[in-house]
Regions:
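Short active-site oxyanion
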Residues: 23-27, 49-52, 167-172, 223-229
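SAM cofactor-binding core of SAM-dependent methyltransferases
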Residues: 23-98, 143
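Short, solvent-exposed loop/turn segments at secondary-structure junctions
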Residues: 10, 34-37, 58-60, 122-125, ...
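Conserved beta-strand scaffold positions in the cores of enzyme catalytic domains, especially
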Residues: 52-54, 172-173, 247-252
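SAM-dependent nucleic-acid methyltransferase catalytic core
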Residues: 1-15, 70-193, 197-203
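Long, positively charged, glycine-interspersed low-complexity recognition regions
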Residues: 207, 211-278
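Short His-Asn-centered micro-motif
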Residues: 30-31, 55-56, 174-176, 194-196, ...
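S-adenosyl-L-methionine
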Residues: 1-32, 36-37
C-alpha cells in the first residue's frame, strides 16, 4: 500500500500468511491498521472465503478504508495533489492532529482520508504520524529508472486491478473494540489475525488505552473463541502463562524494527512471535 503505520506488517506479512488456514469462510483483523497481512494473502486459494472484516479503533484508519472502497473517486480526487511538498505535508498534519473534527463512519470523509494518506505515505516507516517529519526522496526508482514518491506509489494502486481485487474483497468495515468484533464474527469457520499494540509500546498508538489488563482481556477473548486465531507479539513473561507452549503453537522470526528505524543507521533487530490455537 506504500502507507507506513506503527507496528505494520509489510515486512513480515508473507511469513504470517504461510500459517493462515485456507479453508476459512470469514477473515477478521481486530487491529487492522493498514491491513498488510490481508494484502499479502493469495486470495484465490481461499475458495470458501465469503467475508473479510476490517476493524480498527482509530477512526482515521477506518475512514481511510471506507474511502478506499471507492478507489476510483479516491484516485480522481488526488490527481492534482503535489508530491513531497513540505508546506502541504505540514498543513495536512495540522488539519489531522491539531484541529478538532468528528468523523461519521456512515459518511466517509475523502478530504480527511487523502490528507491522512499523504502523511502516512511520506513519514519514516513505523513513525507516529503526529510526530513524523516529511521524508524527501523516500520513494523508489522503478525499472524504468523513473523516481516515484511513496504517495505516487500509493495513488497508482488505486487504478491497479490487482489492488482492486483486495479492496473489493473487503465486505465489512468496523470501528469497534477488539472484544466486540471478536464476539460479532466468531464462528468455527472464522479466522482472526490479531496484531495488538505490543506490551510496553502502547503509547506509540493513537486512540489506544492498552494496559496490562487489556492485554489479558484480549488473551481471554482469544482463548474463549470458537474460531482460529494467530496472535503477533514480542515476548513478555505473561504470554507463557496465558498461552502455554504445551497448548498453543508458537513460531518466531527475527526482523528489523521499522518503528525504531533511524535514517543512515542499521535497523534494530527484534523477534516476532506468532501464537496460534491450531
Amino acid at each position: 500500500m506504500a502507507l507506513s503505520y506503527i507496528g505494520g506488517k509489510s515486512k513480515i506479512g508473507t511469513w504470517i500468511r504461510n500459517y493462515i488456514p485456507n479453508n476459512i469462510e470469514t477473515y477478521v483483523e481486530p487491529f487492522s491498521g493498514m491491513f498488510w497481512v490481508f494484502f499479502k494473502l493469495n486470495t484465490p486459494i481461499f475458495k470458501n472465503l465469503k467475508t473479510v472484516v476490517y476493524n480498527d479503533v482509530n477512526p482515521l484508519n477506518v475512514n481511510l478504508y471506507l474511502c478506499l472502497k471507492d478507489y476510483k473517486k479516491f484516485w480522481e480526487m488526488t490527481q492534482n495533489t503535489p508530491i513531497e511538498n513540505k508546506e502541504l505535508f505540514n498543513k495536512c498534519k495540522s488539519d489531522l492532529f491539531d484541529t478538532e473534527f468528528v468523523l461519521d463512519m456512515n459518511n466517509p470523509n475523502f478530504d480527511i482520508a487523502i490528507k491522512y494518506a499523504y502523511v502516512l505515505s511520506q513519514v519514516w516507516s513505523g513513525t507516529d504520524p503526529k510526530k513524523g517529519n516529511l521524508i524527501l526522496k523516500g520513494g523508489y526508482e522503478g525499472k524504468d529508472g523513473v523516481y516515484k514518491s511513496k504517495f505516487e506509489i500509493f495513488r497508482s494502486k488505486l487504478i491497479d486491478p490487482k489492488w482492486h481485487r483486495y479492496f473489493d474483497a473487503i465486505t465489512n468495515i468496523e470501528n469497534l473494540d477488539f472484544e466486540e468484533v471478536i464476539k460479532k464474527y466468531d464462528s468455527p469457520t472464522t479466522y482472526f489475525y490479531c496484531d495488538p499494540p505490543y506490551f510496553k509500546t502502547e503509547d506509540y498508538y493513537i486512540n489506544h488505552d492498552f494496559g496490562i489488563q487489556t492485554h489479558e482481556r484480549l488473551a481471554n477473548a482469544l482463548k474463549a473463541m470458537e474460531g482460529r486465531f494467530s496472535l503477533s507479539y514480542y515476548h513478555f513473561d505473561l504470554l507463557d502463562k496465558w498461552f502455554p507452549v504445551t497448548e498453543y503453537t508458537w513460531k518466531d522470526k527475527e526482523f528489523a524494527k521499522t518503528a525504531m528505524a533511524v535514517p543512515g543507521k542499521a535497523q534494530t533487530k527484534g523477534t516476532e512471535i506468532l501464537i496460534m490455537n491450531y
